[in-house]
Swiss-Prot record:
Enzyme Commission number: 3.5.4.16
Catalysed reaction equations from the record: GTP + H2O = 7,8-dihydroneopterin 3'-triphosphate + formate + H(+)
Protein name per UniProt: GTP cyclohydrolase 1
Subunit and interaction comment: Toroid-shaped homodecamer, composed of two pentamers of five dimers.
Gene: folE
Species this protein is from: Agrobacterium fabrum (strain C58 / ATCC 33970)
GO molecular function: GTP binding; GTP cyclohydrolase I activity; zinc ion binding
GO CC terms in record: cytoplasm
Length: 208
């Protein structure tokens, strides 16, 4: 049976910004200040264009602040052959930045849900991970945000999210433990209430 596309309002709007965004020139000057603070000379040849490059890179790295998750999740499909079992998208690569030190977080996300009459396009799940990843984050918060946005928009029987990531704030500084990763999970609905469904999710993620 052909899918029927419907639009629904969803969760995950762009975060509120307390103040007006600084100008490009102000952002570039802030980079020059940091370079001087680090002991560098922003006027030397190799650093002349660095402020502009950093500002451009940050606009890309933090593009999630410009995007609204509900715009991604607002379109769902009905009448997909009566399918009502687990939908899992695993090994979604992502990067984010630690909100405490503004250094990278690199990992993979695994996202599953149990449909209740509607399903999402598979690319939409990966897109949600990307949007939340391209913001300053803690891994715990990002895990919960992904689950909550799908839960509130799709209204499935349950959502399961697992993130496995390495934090450069632990690898490059502080305790300097390269290769250590952090695992977080978030469950809603049936996944939260039924341990057997949690085990099934974990098994599906790990089976290759």
């Amino acid at each position: 049976m052909d899918a029927i596309v419907k639009n629904f309002p969803g969760a995950g709007a762009k975060p509120d910004v307390a103040e007006a965004r600084p100008s490009q020139a102000e952002a570039e000057e802030a980079v020059r200040v940091l370079l001087r603070w680090a002991g560098e000379n922003p006027a030397r040849e190799g650093l002349l264009d660095t402020p502009k490059r950093v500002a451009k890179a940050y606009r890309e790295l933090f593009a999630g602040y410009e995007l609204n998750v509900q715009d991604v999740l607002g379109t769902t499909f009905e009448e997909v052959g009566g399918y009502d079992d687990v939908v899992l998208v695993r090994d979604i690569p992502f990067f984010s930045h630690c909100e405490h030190h503004m250094v990278p977080i690199v990992g993979k996300a695994h996202v599953a849900y149990l449909p209740a009459g509607r399903v999402l396009g598979l690319s939409k799940i990966a897109r949600v991970v990307e949007i939340f990843g391209r913001r300053l984050q803690t891994q715990e918060n990002m895990t919960a945000q992904i689950a909550r946005s799908i839960e509130e928009t799709l209204k499935p029987r349950g959502v399961a999210v697992m993130i496995d990531a390495e934090h450069m704030c632990m690898s490059m500084r502080g305790v300097n433990k390269q290769g250590s990763t952090t695992l977080t999970t978030s469950f809603t609905g049936t996944f939260k209430n039924d341990p057997a469904e949690q085990v099934r999710f974990m098994t599906m993620v790990r089976n290759r």
